[in-house]
Every structure is written in structure tokens, then in C-alpha cells.
Amino acid sequence: MALISLTNGYLSFSDAPLLDHAELHIEPNECVCLVGRNGAGKSTLLKIIAGDVLMDDGKIQYEKDLVVSRLEQDPPRNAQGNIFDYVAEGVGHLTDLLKEYHQISVQLEENYSDQILSQLEQVQAKLEHADGWRFENKINEVLLKLGLNPNTKLSALSGGWLRKAALARALVCDPDVLLLDEPTNHLDVEAIEWLENFLLDFQGSIVFISHDRSFIRKMATRIVDLDRGQLVSYPGNYDLYLTTKEENLRVEALQNELFDKRLAQEEVWIRQGIKARRTRNEGRVRALKVMREERRQRRDVMGTAKLQLDTSSRSGKIVFEMEDVSYEIAGKTLLKDFSTTILRGDKIALVGPNGCGKTTFIKLLLGEIQPTSGKIRCGTKLEIAYFDQYRADLDPEKTVMDNVADGKQDIEINGVKRHVLGYLQDFLFPPKRAMTPVKALSGGERNRLLLAKLLLKPNNLLILDEPTNDLDVETLELLEEILTDYQGTLLIVSHDRQFIDNTATECYLFEGKGHLNKYVGGFFDAKQQQANFWASKAVEEQAKAKKSEPLKEESAVKNDRTSKPKSVKLSYKEQRELEQLPQLLEELETKITVLQAEIADPAFFQQAHDITDAKLKALADTEAELETAFLRWEELEEKKNLVEGKA
């Protein structure tokens, strides 16, 4: 039985309805990806499923006591309190208890007293009774993986960080159905991969919207296409959907062509005059009227954007040269002793976590900031086009047309003059929309407009900082084709793994503490090389560690004889942690054994790169987690023994 059933759904805000008597059924334990062009109504459909928007007609039914959680595309900006409280509200029945526990814990850390400790113990007992620790641990895990400080005030968050907090809130409540609108937006690759694994373990149904094709391929068990008001279900994976959809559109185009040809013939016949109005032909006249109405009601497929680059003369052979470049800010090293030569025609992707220094790297190359040490030399004859992730190159008060042509009627691309309205239609801006102020545009429309403006500028060095945000898949794929054929030098900052893999020939991976390493190939090739490099390094470190163990043990014995036990005491939190660590260690060891067996299989490396890469990374992460957990267990055990010995 379906968890949610939408039947005969109809909703319209304009001439063309978003839902035109559509149907959708969400079954238990499935992961549905909702696809469609920008503006098709995908986000509105999620709001309908969540019960936040009512349809004009139709019915939606839910299984009894069904719990639905939704991540909004644009989280509310007027939320109050700190991140922990906001996320805990997603749990519902335990919200107040979890908030109280967090607040008292913070008070205890800042100002210890027996009274506060007593309050904490009372709340802990209530949480224990209500099985609340599971949710408290989940909240802390999600916040950690998304890089969120639980005590940060929501009012201090930018839109991207607020969206992360909203994602955390949607994930923690154990719903039956999880609705996610662009969950990978503003997440770096590491966070996206964690989210994928988190959702794969989720015991419920998921309906999500995403333009991240790698994410869709990994997650979706079914594709539902919202196309011109209709919901069409495609069982199976994303690639099967693409093939089937292409064939369906081909058949539809052929049928429309035949219909239009027959309609044209009937129109010629009706104009022949009196013969058409004889009684014996009244049926044919009525049929023609039906055909006219059918053609009037038909909604044609939306066109795709038409992109082309205005390339300039070639740059010099060497575009940039960096020699032992370091950069520090506020005591943090973003780049350390990095050297490279970027040549004409190179297509390089900068990959790393949020805040690691990718945009800083570009600013260093462009001379907008100076390195702390080292030298950067620019090549000759450079003409640069820069796609800024903050969209600062757009004037929100000006119209779409004026942003591109600055009040002129004509633009020039590759030596050919065109009317600005015709050019903007290539980017899916009809004349009426071209006269709209930029501040009224959606995120996807702003991205298309920035591309339209950027591609007008003659260039031989193209820098794209997060170009894929809010672009629909069709426009993304067209952009990829153009960049593949681009003869200049390309620098990309993106968290879209498929986009990087399809456009870059080399990846610079930020690996922490200012270390930046270069790998040949697209994203998945680079990650495979990185995994192999760190795996071999881990083996070397283990070998060194084994050699030094006898010396460490001898030193430890001497230290034990001479050192005096310190006065220490385990806190309640530490006692709980110590009790839980043995089970965690056992689980991690089991997980490592399973992963090692999978990797040892001869067929392992015959799988797709993203699968092998994920397994290798999971093994490295789990081994690191085991080591950290074991060291923590040793630390707490030693602390406990010192206390007992003193007593």
C-alpha cells in the first residue's frame, strides 16, 4: 500500500498549470528523484506532499500516523536561537528535553556547580527514559559532519549555512517520508558523500530534487519526471531514465509532426468553400474543430539554452607560474609551498572542502591578493572571463536586457551582430522576461543570465567559480559540451563531481593544512589516485609504528615508575562515553573486516570509479575512526584507573 497517494492533482498559477490532473504514489522504502526543468513546479509539488500548499483540484491521501519531514529550497531567515535548538525542533516530541539538556551542558562547562550538575542528571534520567540519547547523538553527528557549531546563533548565518542547518533539522527526526529540495547545494564533496551514506542507511522513503547527477545516480531507485504538468514515472536508475525519456520525446515529436501535417491539410480543405459545409461533411468539420482545440491545448517541450563562447586570440604558452607559494590569513595556512605551471589549454578543477582556500587560490592568480611568500608570474596576452560564485557582476536593479547590453539594442559575438532580445532567447529569456529586473529572477535564471553576460566577453582564460548551482541538467550538459570544445585555459571551482569529471583534465585537491596536490584526469580518476596514495602511505606509517613500539613500551615503563598520578575525575558524560566505547570499537573492527574482504575480491577494481573510490575512502575513514576511538578509550581507562587507585 502506498504511503502517499496524489490523484487527479491540479494546480495553476498562470495559463499553464503546474499540475494538470497528475498522479503520484510514494511506496515504502523507495528513493524517488523528482526531475524537470527549472520552473516546472518541482518545489511546489514537494510542498503539496508536505501539506504546505493546497491544490486547486484533486486529492492527496496519507497512510495513518505518517510522519513527513521536508527540507525547503529556501529556509526561513527569521528563525531565532542557536543551531542546536533549531535542529532539535525537527525531533518534535523530545525538542524541549533536548534543548534543556544542551543548555544545561553549556552552563556546566562555563560555570561548574553541584546545583547545575544535579539539574543535568535529572534531565539525563528523563532522556534515558524517553530513549532520547539516540536523537541527541544523531543531532551531534549530523552537526559535526555538516561543519555546524551547535552554539552559533542563526541570525549570524549566511544563506548557505542556514540551508545546512535546515538540512540537519530535516535529517534528525526519523520520519517515514523525507522530502529534500536540492540537498547538496552549498555542501562540499566530503559532506555530499557523507549525506549519501546517511541517506542510504535511512529506514524510510525519500523524495528529492537535485541537479547533481552523481548524487541522483547513487541514490535514486525511481525517477519521476514533471513535464508540462504531468508526472511520468520511470522505474530504475537515472541512465535508464535518460535513454527512455529521449526515445519518448522522439516519438512525441514524430506524432506532433504528423498531427500538424494532417491539421494543415484539413485547414486547406475547410477554406475550399461551400463543399466543406454540405451536410455529409459536417462530421469532418466537427473533427477539425476538435483538432484545433487539441493543438491549442498542446504544451510543447521547452527549448534548451543555446550557448557559445566568444573566444579571443591565443594567450602565451605559459598562463601562470607559481613557485613555493604560501598564503596565511588570521593564523591559518591556506596554501603552503605550492609550485605549479599552468599551460595554455589546461583544464583544471580545484576541489576541496568549504573554506579550504579554493577562491583564495584564484584571487592569488589574478593578483587580487598577494602571497605570504613565494612568487606568481602571469603569462602574456591573457583575456580573462570570471564567473563569480557570488554573482557580483549582476546589477539587481537593472533589467536582464540592460545587464547584458548596457542599454544597447545589439550585441556582438564572434564578429556577428545580434539583437539583444534574440540573444537572450538563446538563454531561455523571452522578451517579456528580458525586461524584468534581475532582483525578481530565480537562482537558476540568475545563473543563466551571468552565463549570457560572461560568454559575450572575448576570452582565452575562463574561470568558473561554482557555475552549476541552480542550473537544470539540460543547461549543465550544454555547458559541459562547450567547455570540452573550449580552446583556451579553464579553471573550475565546483562540488559537482560529474561536472568536474566531464570537463577537467587535471584536479588540484586541497588536502588540509595548506597542502595542495595535483592529480591527472577528471574527478573520479583523481580521487582514485588520491586513495591509492594515502593507502600506500598508511602502510608505510604502520610499518614504522611497529618498529618503534618496543621503544615506546620501554619509555612508558620508565615514565610509570617516575610519574605521580594526577587528581582527576570522570564526568558523567565521560562515564557514558567509556561505557559505549567497547561496543563502538567492536562495530568498527567488524566494518573494517567486511570492507577489507570486499576490496580483496579480484573483481573489486572492475567496478565503476565512484563505487571503488567510496569503498577505499570508507576503509581509510573507518581505520582512522578506530584509531581515534581506541586512543580515547585508553585515555578514559587510564583516567578511571588513576581515580580508583587514589581511592
Curated annotation (Swiss-Prot):
GO terms for cellular component: cytoplasm. Residues 545-563 have a biased composition (Basic and acidic residues). The keyword Nucleotide-binding applies. Residues 545-569 are annotated as: Disordered. PROSITE patterns: ABC_TRANSPORTER_1, ABC_TRANSPORTER_2. Residues 559-647 are annotated as: C-terminal domain (CTD), binds DNA. Its EC number is 3.6.1.-. Gene3D superfamilies: P-loop containing nucleotide triphosphate hydrolases (3.40.50.300), Valyl-tRNA synthetase, C-terminal domain (1.10.287.380). Belongs to the ABC transporter superfamily. ABCF family. Uup subfamily. The C-terminal domain (CTD) helps bind DNA. Probably plays a role in ribosome assembly or function. May be involved in resolution of branched DNA intermediates that result from template switching in postreplication gaps. Binds DNA and has ATPase activity. NCBIfam families: PRK11147.1 (NF008358). This is ATP-binding protein Uup. It comes from Haemophilus influenzae (strain ATCC 51907 / DSM 11121 / KW20 / Rd).
